[in-house]
A protein has these predicted regions:
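Short acidic-hydrophobic, aromatic-tinged amphipathic segments that line or gate anion-handling sites
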Residues: 98-102
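Short hydrophobic/aromatic patches at helix-to-coil boundaries
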Residues: 107-111
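Acidic phosphotransfer microenvironment of two-component signaling modules
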Residues: 82, 104-105
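Amphipathic alpha-helical interaction surfaces in cytosolic regulatory modules
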Residues: 20-97
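Conserved catalytic submotifs in the C-terminal HATPase_c
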Residues: 8-9, 48, 104
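Short beta-strand/loop segment at the start of cytosolic alpha/beta domains
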Residues: 1-15
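Residue-level detector of flexible, active-site-proximal loop/helix-junction positions
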Residues: 12, 20, 104
Length: 111
């Protein structure tokens, strides 16, 4: 998995590229901590290029949501692929995340 981040006015945007699976979980968490300066801003995760997610990947997103919330910041997911949306629905996590059709829409929801 490749993870890139950039600071925007409303939030830090994290772009995921590839799989978010058991093999990527530790790197995901480490990179998120570094990219967000230990959760000092709202976060938008751009899932456009997220190709696959497993149960550990879901746990990683839940961890990110919990960390953001415990630091009084908000998390938004953008451009979630249908396959991942289906997994959210099957695991009953579809209500656990605020999802948006674009990064811009996710950022606007933070205002």
């Amino acid at each position: 998995m490749n993870i890139a981040s950039e600071q925007h006015v409303a939030a830090i945007v994290i772009r995921l590229d590839g799989d978010l699976t058991v093999d990527d979980s530790d790197n995901f968490k480490r990179t998120i901590r570094e990219s967000t300066n230990d959760f000092s801003s709202d976060i938008v995760v751009d899932c456009t290029s997220l190709s696959q997610i497993d149960s550990v990947g879901l746990e990683s997103l839940l961890w990110l949501s919990d960390e953001a919330r415990s630091n009084n910041y908000r998390l938004r997911l953008a451009c979630v692929p249908q396959t991942v949306t289906n997994i959210f629905r099957l695991t009953r996590l579809d209500g656990a995340f605020s999802t948006h059709p674009s990064v811009e829409a996710a950022a606007r929801s933070l205002n």
